[in-house]
């Protein structure tokens, strides 16, 4: 029997060689000053180009969009040139790579955004959330986030425009497409989830209103670069970074239906993945399948067996394997051949240099 993970699949105008996705993972190794992607990052992604699709780590669309020290941006000429090194290296290995466009909203600290106050849907501080800043050492310094200010309508318009420009910048940098990060408690998620949004204008209250900002951003990016190059990531059931929705099934089924109207090329659902996390309800997965007609990606707690089963049963079209890709640059070959997986070193995930980024070997037998 052929493993369903190794069937090719059409993603817009691109044929992908398999259904294995390297999902976005922050590694905090951008060149300083300037937060630019670099040769080391190019080597890292090129090593993993056997994935059907690579979604690069979140890249902030503006200086205000940065939540953590040393993450890459995509708003300056220097940053576009840095990412071009990455996309060229991946394309040389016949890989396909999308950029993940990121604005953290309230999940930051003034030290990461030039001393400014963070912005969000509402002036609600994310409770019990820390981010890391550059404290002058090689180790990230963790600090509590601060209360944001509520975005004005002018702020909203400006950020929609920043997303549009970032999408254009990503194509200029050689990316095959972009993924809008609307998950994990960051800015767009702060509008979507009821408990993070207490606005009383057209961007708050009802599900339709809370999805309005998402729709405006997607519409701007689709107009700029085409729907066949735009994907979106959602996280319906996570409470990461302090965002919670009171009715996640209803909210996120409506989000899937909205995104279907824009004919985006894929919808990427991040499932809760801590050790004893509950399973995503099957009823929700089938509701999403019915609401959204494009390529579906699920990521979170998948091993090769579970991933293959999900694709074979039609629950999803592609599967993201996050942490396994850190220590296994040749993950598709290891899955296909039943080779053992290496474990990653958690101490080298964020910050630092080559160690823990590009020194994990391929399987040697």
Model regions: which residues?
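Flavin-dependent oxidoreductase catalytic cores
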Residues: 1-365
């Amino acid at each position: 029997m052929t493993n369903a993970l190794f069937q090719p699949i059409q993603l817009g105008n691109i044929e992908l060689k398999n259904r294995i996705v390297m999902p976005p993972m922050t590694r905090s190794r951008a060149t300083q000053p300037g937060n630019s992607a670099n040769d080391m990052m190019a080597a890292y992604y090129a090593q993993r180009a056997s994935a059907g699709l690579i979604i690069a780590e979140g890249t902030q669309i503006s200086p205000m969009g940065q939540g953590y020290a040393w993450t890459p941006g995509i708003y300056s000429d220097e940053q576009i040139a840095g990412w071009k090194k990455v996309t060229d290296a991946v394309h040389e290995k016949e890989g396909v790579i999308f950029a993940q466009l990121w604005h953290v909203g309230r999940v930051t600290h003034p030290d990461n955004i030039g001393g400014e106050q963070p912005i969000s849907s509402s002036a609600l501080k994310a409770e019990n959330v820390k981010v890391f800043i550059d404290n002058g050492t090689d180790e990230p310094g963790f600090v509590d986030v601060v209360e944001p200010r509520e975005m004005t309508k002018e702020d909203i318009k400006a950020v929609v425009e920043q997303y549009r420009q970032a999408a254009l910048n990503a194509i200029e940098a050689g990316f095959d497409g972009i993924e809008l990060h609307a998950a994990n408690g960051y800015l767009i998620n702060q509008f979507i989830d009821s408990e993070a949004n207490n606005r009383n204008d057209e961007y708050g209250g009802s599900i339709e209103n809370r999805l309005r900002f998402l729709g405006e951003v997607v519409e701007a990016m689709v107009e700029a670069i085409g729907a066949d190059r735009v994907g979106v990531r959602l996280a319906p059931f996570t409470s990461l970074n302090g965002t919670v929705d009171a009715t996640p099934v209803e909210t996120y089924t409506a989000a899937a239906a909205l995104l279907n109207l824009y004919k985006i090329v894929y919808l990427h659902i991040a499932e809760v993945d801590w050790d004893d996390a509950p399973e995503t309800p099957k009823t929700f997965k089938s509701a999403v399948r019915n609401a959204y007609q494009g390529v579906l990606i699920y990521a979170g707690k998948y091993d090769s067996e579970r991933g293959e089963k999900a694709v074979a049963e039609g629950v999803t079209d592609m599967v993201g394997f996050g942490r396994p890709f850190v220590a296994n640059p040749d993950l598709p070959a290891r899955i296909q051949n039943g080779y053992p997986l290496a474990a990653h070193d958690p101490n080298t995930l964020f910050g630092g240099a080559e160690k823990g980024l590009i020194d994990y070997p391929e399987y040697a037998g």
